[in-house]
Amino acid sequence: TVSGAGKLAASYDPDFVLIEEVDLNSTRSYHVNEYTILKECLADYDTVFAQNYDSAFLFYPFTQPHGKSRSGLALFSRYPVTDSLRRSFPVSTSFSKFFDLDRCYSISRVPVDNGKELVIFELHMSAYGNSDAIREGQIRMLSEDMQKEYEAGNYVLCGGDFNHDLKAAEDDSADKESWAYPFPREELPEHFAFCIDQLTAQEKN
């Protein structure tokens, strides 16, 4: 349950919690406001919400339609968030647009004692075989924004639903049937890396 997930997250006493696909009023979650539940579980945290989907009714999948959907990204911070901005990712303009979310990311700022800021990017990227141009455009846009913050002397943290296979190597062709593409790490700015890459093979599994 959402309450169970919120309580589990709180039990780790985290500094930050990033949760995607948080429904405000959606058929799939029986119109329960999941954001309200999470805020109750993480009551002592500052919070930011970035809406990335608002559909009156989605007729997909056809055998069991999503129906009404209103959802987004939720960030919870132990430290005060002084400013936050929602940025829209480029998405497909073809017919598939009607079956995908309005992908976005939020940029939230947390002041640090040395006068700089910790800038937290929370994202939800496109999935289900979108075009290479869309994937590349989303990664390029995100990378440029992160690089600007790095060059300004700020600390940058990025998390969320990448909708990529973060474990797979970019030249790994072992699983061609998977919808999740390996993340093109070479497109990241020089000073950025995935935390998962610091883990051993056993820890990744």
Predicted regions and their residues:
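Metal-dependent phosphoester/phosphodiester hydrolase catalytic core
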Residues: 99, 109-136
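Structural recognition of the beta-strand scaffold that forms the well-ordered cores
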Residues: 16-20, 49, 119-122, 156-159, ...
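Metal-dependent phosphoesterases centered on the DNase I-like endonuclease/exonuclease/phosphatase
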Residues: 130, 134-205
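Glycine-rich, highly charged phosphate/nucleotide-binding loops
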Residues: 1-10
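Structured beta-strand-rich core segments of catalytic domains in phosphoester-bond hydrolases
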Residues: 22-117
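Active-site environment of divalent metal-dependent phosphoester hydrolases
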Residues: 24-27, 55-58, 127-130, 163-169
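Proline-aspartate-enriched helix->loop->beta-strand connector
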Residues: 9, 13-23
